[in-house]
Amino acid sequence: MSEASRLCSGYYSLNQSFVEPFQCPRRGEGAALQYCCGFADLKYCCSEPGSYFPYKHSYMWSLSIGALIGLGIAALVLLAFVISVCVLCYLFLYTKPQRLDTGLKLQHLEASSTQEGKSNGKTKALNSNAASNATNETYYEADDIIQEKTMDATQIHIAY
């Protein structure tokens, strides 16, 4: 073991008083404390080279209660944020409005007129009678009748 690791050089402590250089182990200390350890403002003899804390590590928990409380609050806020984001994503993805039935089915007039023509002979009679009058009036009357019958059929389907 080198003599340099046993010699602690002089230093200024926190209260700006000068501490004289000393040799490890000091008088009254155990023989195992052979190394000079510590910082520039606090030096002491220790059993392992490179040790920087003269106290047990548990002192750090008692000194940082405020930091632990702050970290705990920050963790709770982060947890609340993550839960809120998850709930909002669930609501957005799984509670989309369902397709509402307006009660009206959209159909092409040609398709509905052929279906009505097959099922109802009165429409054909109306079309042939109206053709003798005026061509424009025939189309308007036939379209009105077809639309009324389509709406009636749709309302019957909705009622069931």
Swiss-Prot record:
It holds the Pfam family Shisa_N. One of its GO terms (cellular component) is membrane. The keyword Membrane applies. It comes from the Eukaryota. InterPro entries: Shisa, Shisa_N. It is found in: Membrane. Coiled coil: none annotated. It is a single-pass membrane protein. The chain crosses the membrane at residues 65-85. Keywords: Membrane, Transmembrane, Transmembrane helix. Belongs to the shisa family. This is Protein shisa-like-2B. It comes from Homo sapiens. The gene is SHISAL2B.
